[in-house]
């Protein structure tokens, strides 16, 4: 299985995996609008890979078969100030 990976021009660290290069028929229109301009990052042979950055390769494969695409969004950013405040509150 091979897929094309595109980087979002609108959202940092957001990637769209599709089954074929430049074929976005399975991707919902609202998602395409949110994604913004697309930049091809790479073509990936999934069958030859064990891991895929922060994405779970098995979830990517299933999503490509069932939906025709996979959207990778970055993990939520940790608010270090809030985390520090919570730690201080627990110490009281």
Swiss-Prot record:
Residues 1-85 form the YcgL domain. Pfam families: YcgL (PF05166). Coiled coil: none annotated. It comes from the Bacteria. This is YcgL domain-containing protein Sfri_1738. It comes from Shewanella frigidimarina (strain NCIMB 400).
